[in-house]
Amino acid sequence: MPREKKKRGRRAEKSQSKRKREDEEVSDSPKRQRTTNEDNDALAGDDYIPLDTHDTEKEQEQGQEDDTPFYGLLDTEEQEYFSKASQTLELNSFEDDDDKRLFIESVYTEAKGKELKIACSQSCSRLMEKLIAMSTPAQVKALFEKFSGHFLHLVQHRFASHCCECLFIRAAPIVTSEMEKPKDKKKDRKQTIETNGEDGELDEPINQKPAMDLFLGVVSELEGNWGYLLTESFASHTIRVLLLILAGEPLADHSNARVLASRKKENVDSITSTAQAELTIRESRQVPAEFNNTLRKMISDLSAGLNSTYLQALATHPIGSPVLQVILSIELGCMGKEKVKDKSSVFRRLIPDDTLETKEEGVNFLNSLFYDPVGSRLLETIVRVAPGKFFKTFYKTVIRERIGSLARNEIASYVVIKVLERVSREDLQSAIESILPEIPSLVQRSRLNVIKTIIDRSTVRSADTTSLAKALESAYGEDGLVRLKTILGVEATDKDAESVKPKAATSAQHLHGSLLAQSMLQAPGGLATMIQTSFLAAPVEILIQIAKNPTASRALQEALKPSKSNTQFRRQLLPRFYGQMCDLSLDNSGSHVADALWDATSDLVFIKQRLAQELADNESALRDSFLGRAVWRNWSMDLYKRKRGEWMSRAKGLDNTRVSAPTADSSAEPAKSKLDLARARYAARAEQQEKPDSREQGPRGKKQALSAPSGLLKAQ
């Protein structure tokens, strides 16, 4: 049977309630009914907190949407064109740089007047990021001016905020270049006008603002809104970049990378950036004095009205805490000791001067940060950049007695790593003794970061690691083969490894194990011996399996590095690779081990000859493979087949250069004997006596005679 038509949802309920109200008679009730006006009055009151805020939140969202300007949408043809342009830039299949430059100019011409639409478009905002990364300084500044006046809304937009961030990073080196060569730019402009005429096109229009003024305009545009931008999910990323640019800090540094962007962000710069651009953002930059003044004012405005309680709450805020980390790193690292002593600074408001020694509240706050996933990041920043006096008090009061239990915790261990990187040799030795009882549990749970840091810092500080080596040997067992399999994670056979794809957590454990083995090999004494004996205990099949593992092969390459202390170890290990050179050379990871065998046999030439002969016997297979050809070239096998004597001298290290013989300077004359030098001096004197008027010949002849013995000594 056909069903009766019924309206569903809120519309049906609304119509039913309306009919009921129309049918029912209005009855006077003795109770006072709350009206909508009274509801609004109550909502307007300061002390009233409504329980049902669903409607209010909707109104606020609608109000925010109304405040945000709408820049329009791209039509279908425009979206299709810009999508194809994005794919073309990603493929980067241009014939030359001029072809690429012309294509970028054509895209800019097509995007003229649509820049804001593209930046706010979900499908085309990535094109804007790629364009910015490939643009010239003049194009970057022109786009900067297009965005000016709209930054307050763009930095809060889900897609446009990434374009703003990319624009700031690309424009930061332009500020430094304009500071360094302002006069040269004027000369270039005059020369361009003289060459092209007054109507000729310039690479950089004369009426463009300097990049410094563009950045100052952004700060003034955002001024007065720092309070809510600090914890805004999209704007906070842009604020962090802006702070680092004003301070002249590196934008691609490892310590700053985690506070600039999340792990989920697509790395567009890896596709588009050049080596020179990458170098400019990895280094500290010189900034004008106006940036320093603006930075101080910006930090004071950001923290204005934030008392100690609010700052401590901000320390564990997932969005506000990274901004606080950048502010603290700038205050403690760039603004000098005077700013640290200032009671109005963010650092002193967060942690007062007498907190650690007299007040328990401050100590409790710092203790709570150890176990918080967000707060521990802030604590790492404080440990890394805090003044020495504060760090010593902090270590003595908070960390020293409980460093063992902190190292055992999954989150607090990262703070312990930063502490170990900064302590003195005596404190490091006492910290090792405190952490030793936790070594078995750390090994069992594969928490190897702390152990690796202890080994690295002990190598730098020349601390004693005998007790640590014994603890690791007891934790991993005395059997060398089992120990090696456990550390490097090679328990599965090759067939199992091919069929089963490793999980991310397992891969991370294997990576930490490989890094631990490399650190142990670099440390002197029993730690290196423990890994070396494990490699010697492994059969050939396990060694080849390790060599073909992309993670574990790094440890094997480290073990093969030649040094005076491991000559006997290499003499015993290298014959295990007889008959395996072709197999290793054709593998992606094994080819790196094959390359490492060249340096490993630098003082064992008879082994190097045997391995080179194996490569020569499998020449056809190696030449058919890209990896094999690379190994053939690195082992100088063409020289081995044609000029065995030159190859032997290179194998013995007498000729360290791996350049072919024709590239050498053929015009160099052979070294003269002492008799030839004496004859040259005699001839020079005789020539000088025959031509007494010549003033240049005497000194020149004398110079040749005196410089020849030094050249002879160099040749000998």
Curated annotation (Swiss-Prot):
Recorded GO CC terms: 90S preribosome; nucleolus; preribosome, small subunit precursor
Renumbered to this chain, the Basic residues biased-composition regions fall at: 1-11
Query: Which UniProt keywords are listed?
Result: Nucleus, Repeat, Ribosome biogenesis, rRNA processing
The record's subcellular location field reads: Nucleus, Nucleolus
> Where does the record place Basic and acidic residues bias?
12-37, 52-61, 687-699
> What cystine linkages occur within this chain?
none
- Keyword Lyase assigned to the entry: answer is no
Query: A single GO molecular function, which one?
Result: RNA binding
List residue spans for each Pumilio repeat.
110-145, 305-342, 361-396, 397-433, 534-575, 576-613
Q: Where is this region: Disordered?
A: 1-70, 179-204, 656-716
Q: What is its main location?
A: nucleus
The entry assigns this protein to a family as follows:
Belongs to the NOP9 family.
| Role summary | RNA-binding nucleolar protein required for pre-rRNA processing. Involved in production of 18S rRNA and assembly of small ribosomal subunit.
The name of this protein is Nucleolar protein 9
Source species: Arthroderma benhamiae (strain ATCC MYA-4681 / CBS 112371)
Q: Which gene encodes it?
A: NOP9
